[in-house]
């Protein structure tokens, strides 16, 4: 490398087939030709994609580490990005990254003006692409049927997702307890383990969508098609439900205050929980400001109760710390179960992933997307599999997931273990105390084998991400950051938008209520089973 002259190196950079990644992955080359590389990068707007990608994508994503020249300043980087935004050939994905670029990197901070410029170009290019497109539209319809006996009916017809709720059920059960439970059992905000169903779930994202259409970076919340669909439905449910209740002179804010002031005291002996929801005549802008503060108060008070067994009003008044959801503790031990081993990763891939091709046996006319379905529904032997599959089968046998019966047919060794692995594969987490005893016993064995681990937080990891996406801007560049926006005064004058955001805030409060109630109920269950 010492023999390479500057002119020779510049000749390389001028080659039309040259790509910067060829040299930027070599730290020594970048260091030697630092200023030359900087000069050429400033003139090439496409280098913006390299610069942005360096910060957005992680080292563990099968990407080579990129080294930028030290002489490339913050201003240089912004200049290149502006040129990219103004250039003829722009990529919507990278424009999106600029718009949502997180302010957490010392080496690059994209200004709000540049982000706004990128947003304008993004809209312009999107309109060009989708102007004549024939995409599939999906509608959501939430209705309240006076004559319907079943509490809720979900159906899909010609790309219309319909949620039909029994108006008779709602109007016949107007006690506040049931009205809150409707978010669980009617609107399905939660599953039977009280895990939030509205989160962005990796198992709901197809391989093509994950690798082509979504930003594969921890700095962006994954807004998949499935997540958008659930989000739209939940918003429609919130709007319509609140409207129905108001016709019966019931405000959702009153139900929230009742939960903290009366329900917690009557059911769990928790006193002095202070929650003051916005009044009916308050503007939506002020409602958003007030409820953002109340959310912090709610979490702080519950954490004080966990720590001290009581809520200290004076401590609450002097506290100025912001709530960090990942630090919010549960009142019980062993609250959640998470995967924690290579054994889990390998077994789950072989058993449940369509990409493993383990359920594909075309020579005998059997095809299943997942191997575990093949074992459940068919009688197959080791000899029925292709050579490339047999090694994986032997691994599953060796690790006691499957076995051969006396006739040589493959079957599961322990169905409870398979159920746990499947649940964790699909949901990423299990609620230990909300599982039946046989599953808890099997989980205890897996804990001792270091295959899974316990966690003692109030919210699951996915729930923490969901809350942070909606409320804060610390974790995700594309977050709504509603709490930050209203607490710090950086909001618009759009009253319609404030109304939409207020309903999101209300949904967040309902989620927190269900999680707190579940936590306290689990404490009672755990104490009874000691």
Describe the function of each predicted region:
Residues 1-284:
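Long amphipathic alpha-helical coiled-coil/heptad-repeat bundle
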Residues 22, 26, 41, 45, ...:
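Intrinsic-disorder-associated interaction segments
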Residues 44, 59, 187-190, 194, ...:
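Short, flexible helical or helix-coil boundary motifs
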Residues 20, 40, 55-57, 67, ...:
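Sequence-level detector for tyrosine residue identity
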Residues 315-530:
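Amphipathic, oligomerization/interface secondary-structure segments
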Residues 216-381:
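Short, amphipathic alpha-helical interface elements at domain boundaries
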